[in-house]
Amino acid sequence: MKFPFQIKPELFDKVVNPEGKVEIGQKEIKFNGSPKEQFFFSNLTGGKYRNPAWELINIESKIGISEIGSFKTNKVNLWGWKHVICPELFFKIFIKPGQSIEWSRNYNIYKVK
């Protein structure tokens, strides 16, 4: 799993990685096996506003998926278990009565050669 920002584990709010099967790199997260226990990483952005995007490639299935948001995010969480991985891009909303705001999320699913 790749992110468009530097990942700094020392800035995470919470880390749950009981089997140590999730490995954190500078801009990517890799797995050294299939986690049988739940894992969770809170606040991958370290509280800094970043471009909201991620890309996940399954090498065995030769398929990729990515998400890009039209907003800035200051919080990205990552949760997973067994064959599930769930990146969460948070969008902080503050609007007054009568105001409106718009944002979008685009997902792309593709084959990998």
Identify the role of each PLM range.
Residues 1-17, 111-113:
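Acidic (Asp/Glu-rich), glycine- and aromatic
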Residues 24-113:
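Beta-strand-rich recognition/accessory modules
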Residues 11-15, 19-24, 32:
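Conserved functional micro-motifs across diverse proteins
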